[in-house]
């Protein structure tokens, strides 16, 4: 799972901005039974922006102020103006796993394989609710999806399940998940022009767990598969540290890559 956010307060304030920054308004709501937290730049009347959806739990939701603060000065300059929308799953091990799999240890829950339902809801009623409620540009070309850890696996799984997003970022994704690389190799992406960003910490493959230590080789293989399958750019970025290091910074790099003006 994504680590705790290190004491970052929940982002429920109405407005926050640093010196010289674009003000960002926050609001929370329920869509398809899942809590959504949206951070919106202070658009002019009638103006709309792109959307970066973040799959994750409460710890990721509480990182939103840090992410916005790191990126807001670049909006409208090197980055397209965009909203950050965190979607909290009903259950991490259920909704971010593509199929059922045994627990990693006696202390953790088994994976129950509800990933298809989560992505159907995300690409359907959740997107619909967000685009009706928020000043967002419609269409897949204006939507991106990112996730960390098991949510990063879910994000890459979305490449093969939905056409709703034009850019995907699997950040320190759990590509050790049993059978996932075989699935990638045997399955065609829904849209070959989807841009995909992968990243991994350079110490993540040094895990003591025999399954999790495969994450390095699997991620290297995944980028090769993507380069063969896709017509749009894809990239693999290596970060310093293990799975729980620099989470906010890694997410910022991924969002920057997806939202950068070309």
Question: Positions of the model-derived regions?
Answer:
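Non-catalytic cap/lid and distal C-terminal segments of serine-dependent acyl enzymes
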Residues: 4-262
């Amino acid at each position: 799972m994504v680590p705790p956010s290190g004491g970052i307060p929940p982002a429920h304030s109405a407005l926050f901005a640093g010196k010289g920054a674009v003000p960002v308004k926050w609001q929370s709501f329920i869509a398809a039974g899942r809590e959504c937290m949206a951070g919106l730049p202070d658009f002019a009347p009638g103006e709309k922006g792109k959307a970066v959806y973040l799959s994750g739990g409460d710890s990721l939701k509480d990182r939103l102020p840090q992410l916005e603060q790191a990126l807001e000065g670049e909006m409208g300059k090197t980055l397209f103006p965009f909203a950050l929308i965190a979607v909290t799953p009903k259950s991490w091990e259920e909704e971010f796993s593509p199929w059922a799999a045994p627990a990693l240890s006696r202390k953790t829950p088994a994976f129950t394989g509800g990933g298809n339902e989560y992505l159907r809801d995300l690409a359907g009623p959740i997107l619909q609710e967000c685009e009706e409620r928020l000043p967002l540009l419609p269409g897949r070309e204006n939507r991106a999806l990112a996730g960390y850890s098991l949510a990063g696996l879910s994000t890459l799984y979305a490449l093969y399940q939905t056409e709703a997003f034009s850019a995907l970022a699997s950040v320190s994704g759990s590509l050790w998940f049993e059978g996932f690389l075989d699935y990638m190799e045997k399955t065609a992406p829904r849209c070959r022009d989807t841009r995909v960003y992968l990243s991994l910490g350079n110490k993540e493959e040094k895990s003591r767990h025999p399954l999790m230590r495969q994450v390095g080789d699997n991620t290297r293989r995944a980028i090769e598969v993507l380069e063969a399958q896709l017509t749009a750019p894809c990239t693999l970025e290596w970060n310093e540290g293990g799975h729980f290091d620099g989470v906010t910074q890694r997410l910022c790099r991924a969002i920057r890559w997806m939202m950068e003006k070309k």
